[in-house]
């Protein structure tokens, strides 16, 4: 089996534990959540799925984090279910769910 991880940014942008803060500081207009397989690096494993979350001009780290968490939860339930039911292949960095 493999481990999966959710990350609160659209990897490969903003790895590490401060994704929403880093996105706000950089001034991006879209951030989101990434579901990926775990490898030896920090947030560097093959990407399973991503979901976009718009950044509002009045967002705080807390408000953006909460919206990302909501999207992250939906994504996690959907894709872990698909991985279990349908399986997957990883070719290089590309994850395919049949």
Predicted features and spans:
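Donor/substrate-binding cores of folate-linked one-carbon enzymes
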Residues: 1-97
């Amino acid at each position: 089996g493999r481990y999966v991880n959710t990350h609160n940014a659209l990897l490969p942008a903003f790895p590490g534990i401060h994704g929403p803060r880093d996105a706000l500081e950089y001034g991006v207009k879209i951030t989101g959540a990434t579901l990926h397989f775990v490898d030896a690096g920090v947030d560097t494993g093959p990407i399973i799925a991503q979901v976009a979350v718009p950044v509002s001009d009045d967002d705080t780290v807390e408000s953006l984090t909460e919206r990302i968490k909501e999207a992250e939860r939906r994504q996690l339930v959907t894709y872990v279910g698909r991985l279990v039911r349908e399986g997957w292949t990883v070719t290089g960095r590309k994850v395919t769910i049949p």
